[in-house]
Amino acid sequence: MLTLQNSWYDDGHHFVRWRPVSQGLLRAAKLSLGKQLKSYLSLRCTHVKGRGGAKATVRFAQVMAGRYRYVARFDIRSYYESMNHAVLLKLLEDAGIDSEGYELVQDYLSLPDAKLTGCGMVAGGSISPLLGAVYLTPLDRAMEKLQPSHDIRYQRFMDDYLIFAPK
């Protein structure tokens, strides 16, 4: 289904250029998957279309900084490079995406994986941010459960988390 034009590594990240037909398929998949996954993804994940992006994250941080005494900021090292394909595909299956989208994601993950590691995803790919959002959804759900009982607030942009706490 998808075909690569070329691939390269830069600063530890794997990048690819898809053939034009594949680029079109990925643009269409981004729209389709975005619609299918909209209700599945956490509202605290702001890089997803319609969730406010970086500006919403900055506004959130400014408001919370005035209300909470402590803040923790972290990002996940080698985020895209360390994603387990089987875990991601299971999450997509659980989210109920259609078979066409599922098969396209399988291609998207496997083609650049020349060493057959079963891990990693291209950085900067058109559907990588959306798939990354899916991959961290279990962590988002866990954080959402902690918010009321521990009086914490959190927000995520890609793999960057902000957690605010009173003590």
Region spans (language model):
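Conserved polymerase palm-domain catalytic core
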Residues: V58-K167
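Active-site-proximal segment of RNA-dependent polymerases
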Residues: L26-N84
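Generic detector of ordered secondary-structure context
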Residues: P20-V21, L25, G53, I97, ...
